[in-house]
């Protein structure tokens, strides 16, 4: 991807620091053993290289303030939680569920507590006696009670927390027995937080649970002729869009405008029937590659359904993705894609004309989760902004390979960056904007640095699609050009 031409990294005073020297300086604070481990996760991208040159998906250094989550967070908080018509039990002590309760803005349509349950919290509230004697009976009773209290639920998932795996409870046996009793899907998910090195394994475990406990229902429905969708040649599924602030809805609008039929959304505003119906589609459109590539690959291998990673951040990338998607179908869809791109051109030109003069040349440092350290970059470029640093909380090597298509030579790369490292990088690079998560938000705002939260859009959005780009541009302008910042001084400038 080509960044804006108006300002080069060398010309921008904010990036006068040599990033290679900066890495060395920051690592000096560590003991030798820790320094050797962390230096493998930090690098400066060299154009033409096949990847970003960092190690990833490795256990965090003990004692470092990592921003990562756990496997439970990846399964319950990301993949399963947004399935709106299922009840998701946080099986274990109350804290894990309580502190992750409704933390992501997964918008959905429905009546909460009647036929949808996305913002509700259900827990087995493990106590000491449950650790000693086991919690299988308690879990079975909980499922029975939930069925009585919320009869319109379409299924239940059991999101196991650390103690469940440590004491060896058999949640699979409970799930099988309970499913027969209530005649609905009961899905056990072995997502205990101690598994793996981050929330990324939780995504994988959640994907495997869909494969093992939901898709057999698909196969049976196909065999019995009871599947409740009449396939067409234009059927697609949106995979890995969690509808943060309505993002999936914005994406769906564009896909339907070019003539495609969206059969399923995974998993923002999604239902269990949509999961079951997905293996009937002609193409899976993957938004968050990191969290959903596993099930997409499985469907390709098992059902012959191809998949494509798309990006609807910023008009340049939207047009590119629409054309790539349309190329998988016939000339009718391809022609409609061009019509849709042309339809929104005037709107796009108006947004850029308004905000480009106010944002051009501004620098941004990113540090987010699954896909946004690369996917949001084109939207910044479309506004004339510059990326000087980016990194993933829980990225894998293939994420960093994909990132090379979005960044330019000299970009600072940081994997699983610690709180200390990130603060030191920002102090020296002095970007105009920091775009990261809620844990970082107030640290940098107290430094008088403009900040936008890239996990939940700072309670704004949607940011996907052409309409979302207008909101994105407005929000970046609000953050950078608010008069607030002229009234506050950074600690290092005193």
Swiss-Prot record:
Which superkingdom is the protein from?
Answer: Bacteria
Range of residues in the leader sequence = none
Q: How is the cofactor bound?
A: Binds 1 [8Fe-7S] cluster per heterodimer.
Give, as one word, the top-level EC class. oxidoreductase
So where does [7Fe-Mo-9S-C-homocitryl] cluster get bound? Answer: 288, 455
Q: Name one GO biological process term.
A: nitrogen fixation
| MF (Gene Ontology) | ATP binding; iron-sulfur cluster binding; metal ion binding; nitrogenase activity
Keywords tagged on the record: ATP-binding, Iron, Iron-sulfur, Metal-binding, Molybdenum, Nitrogen fixation, Nucleotide-binding, Oxidoreductase
Q: Which InterPro entries match?
A: Nase/OxRdtase_comp1, Nase_comp1_asu, Nase_comp1_CS, Nase_Mo-Fe_asu
The residues the record assigns to binding [8Fe-7S] cluster are 70, 96, 162
- Cofactor(s), names only, from the UniProt record: [8Fe-7S] cluster; [7Fe-Mo-9S-C-homocitryl] cluster
- Can you state which reaction this protein catalyses? N2 + 8 reduced [2Fe-2S]-[ferredoxin] + 16 ATP + 16 H2O = H2 + 8 oxidized [2Fe-2S]-[ferredoxin] + 2 NH4(+) + 16 ADP + 16 phosphate + 6 H(+)
Name one cellular component (GO) term. Answer: molybdenum-iron nitrogenase complex
- Which Enzyme Commission numbers does its entry carry? 1.18.6.1
NCBIfam families the UniProt entry points to: N2-ase-Ialpha, nifD
Q: How does it assemble?
A: Tetramer of two alpha and two beta chains. Forms complex with the iron protein (nitrogenase component 2).
* Job description of the protein: This molybdenum-iron protein is part of the nitrogenase complex that catalyzes the key enzymatic reactions in nitrogen fixation.
The entry sums up its family as follows: Belongs to the NifD/NifK/NifE/NifN family.
Q: What is this protein called?
A: Nitrogenase molybdenum-iron protein alpha chain
Query: Could you tell me which species this protein originates from?
Result: Leptolyngbya boryana
